[in-house]
Amino acid sequence: MRETPTFIVYPGPVYGWAVTAMGSTQSHFFSEKKVAVSYARSWAEANRPARVRVETREGRIEAEWVYEPFRK
């Protein structure tokens, strides 16, 4: 069974917000937090089961969503 993917939304290094899959070396950058969160939630929903975590600049968890597998 595969590990549940976690998509993390965090403040960008200079400005804006970034989204990455845990363990990935690539990020997607957005100027607005709302857009970054929406992107991460859509990404997680398409890859159920999955979770989305929004982190502060200090690394604290600000919000989290869990997407369960589709029911048969």
Where are these regions (language model features)?
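A cross-kingdom feature marking charged/low-complexity
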Residues: R2-P5, G59-K72
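Local beta-strand/beta-hairpin segments that build beta-sheet-rich folds
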Residues: Q26-S27, E62
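A short local loop/turn or secondary-structure capping micro-motif enriched for an aromatic residue
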Residues: S27-H28, V37-S38, F70-K72
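Surface loops and adjacent helix of pleckstrin homology
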Residues: M22, E32, V66
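Short coil turn/linker residues within repeat-based beta-strand modules
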Residues: S24, E58-G59
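A short, charged, amphipathic alpha-helix used as a generic interaction element across diverse proteins
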Residues: F30-P49
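Short aromatic-glycine-(Arg/Gly/Cys) micro-motifs in beta-strand/loop hairpins
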Residues: R2-Q26
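A short amphipathic beta-strand at an alpha->beta junction
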Residues: P49-T56
